[in-house]
Swiss-Prot record:
Entry function: Forms a water channel that facilitates the transport of water across cell membranes, playing a crucial role in water homeostasis in various tissues. Could also be permeable to small solutes including hydrogen peroxide, glycerol and gases such as amonnia (NH3), nitric oxide (NO) and carbon dioxide (CO2). Recruited to the ankyrin-1 complex, a multiprotein complex of the erythrocyte membrane, it could be part of a CO2 metabolon, linking facilitated diffusion of CO2 across the membrane, anion exchange of Cl(-)/HCO3(-) and interconversion of dissolved CO2 and carbonic acid in the cytosol.
Residues on Cytoplasmic side: 1-11, 68-70, 85-92, 156-165, 227-271
GO biological process: ammonium transmembrane transport; carbon dioxide transmembrane transport; carbon dioxide transport; cell volume homeostasis; cellular homeostasis; cellular hyperosmotic response; cellular response to cAMP; cellular response to copper ion
Keyword RNA-binding: no
GO molecular function ontology, one term from the record: ammonium channel activity
Membrane topology: Multi-pass membrane protein
UniProt catalytic activity: H2O(in) = H2O(out); nitric oxide(out) = nitric oxide(in); CO2(out) = CO2(in); glycerol(in) = glycerol(out)
Extent of motif NPA 1: 78-80
Domain of life: Eukaryota
Intramembrane sections: 71-84, 189-201
Modified residues (Phosphoserine): S249, S264
Name by which UniProt lists this protein: Aquaporin-1
Short sequence motif NPA 2: positions: 194-196
Length: 271
């Protein structure tokens, strides 16, 4: 663990997570907030249409940033994804902790900037996740679990280095998965499926009502996705010793921007 801490590529990856998360939150929530402004020419905007726009904003921003920094950090951009890859023994405990901190700080910074830019917006919630009227915490938890499960399952499948049948773009597939999660959950919980995204809005608005739902749900969903993929759908043969080695020291094969160890396939490869 100490050896990974001393590597430049490790800190590049942490910085990449912070910067990408800041851009992701600013672009996606900024796009969602824009739909609250009055529509010009006396036109009205339907809720269903707005949901599609918001879903696409989140999905496309993830796809774009995953393509941009995936070769540097793996582009997790989500503590639930980071937890999933940790439980799947693809990253070390140290990397997981530092990534989650970077993601949360990035979300807070982006939301704070948005707060200043959109301060005149009436009823500005800064994308705060909250349970819709009639939705209790248990139902919201279930929605967050399912929405995150399909996302982390997609990440595990599209970044599985054992596969030889992968075609197309992994970042785009993951972006569509994020959009799909929003289409499912946005009317029930505002769609968290990303604890850091929810945390940034809660911190800046000082509103933590039912906030636990947006941490517990995604983490359960991410853990279930690992259980389903790694132990049922595509079992891994790694023994306990190998798994512990990854948790303490990280993956043996890493993408190095200095060219020390560059693998042939690097697209969205988790570090």
């Amino acid at each position: 663990m100490a050896s990974e801490f001393k590597k430049k590529i490790f800190w590049r990856a942490v910085v990449a997570e912070f910067l990408a998360m800041t851009l992701f939150i600013f672009i996606s929530i900024g796009s969602a907030l824009g739909f609250q402004y009055p529509v010009r020419n006396n036109q009205t905007s339907g809720a269903a249409q707005d949901n599609v726009k918001v879903s696409l904003a989140f999905g496309l921003s993830i796809a774009t940033l995953a393509q941009s920094v995936g070769h540097i950090s793996g582009a997790h951009l989500n503590p639930a994804v980071t937890l999933g890859l940790l439980l799947s023994c693809q990253i070390s405990v140290l990397r997981a902790v530092m990534y989650i901190i970077a993601q949360c700080v990035g979300a807070i910074v982006a939301t704070a900037i948005l707060s200043g830019i959109t301060s005149s917006l009436p009823g500005n919630s800064l994308g705060l996740n909250s349970l819709a009227p009639g939705v209790d915490s248990g139902q919201g938890l279930g929605i967050e679990i399912i929405g995150t499960l399909q996302l982390v399952l997609c990440v595990l499948a599209t970044t599985d280095r054992r596969r030889r049948d992968l075609g197309g773009s992994a970042p785009l597939a993951i972006g569509f998965s994020v959009a799909l999660g929003h289409l499912l959950a946005i009317d029930y919980t505002g769609c968290g499926i990303n604890p850091a995204r929810s945390f940034g809005s809660a911190v800046i608005t000082h509103n933590f009502q039912d906030h636990w739902v947006f941490w517990v749900g995604p983490f359960i969903g991410g853990a279930l996705a690992v259980l389903i993929y790694d132990f049922i759908l595509a079992p891994r043969s790694s023994d306990l010793t190998d798994r512990v080695k990854v948790w303490t020291s990280g993956q043996v094969e890493e993408y190095d921007l200095d060219g020390d160890d560059i693998n042939s396939r690097v697209e969205m490869k988790p570090k």
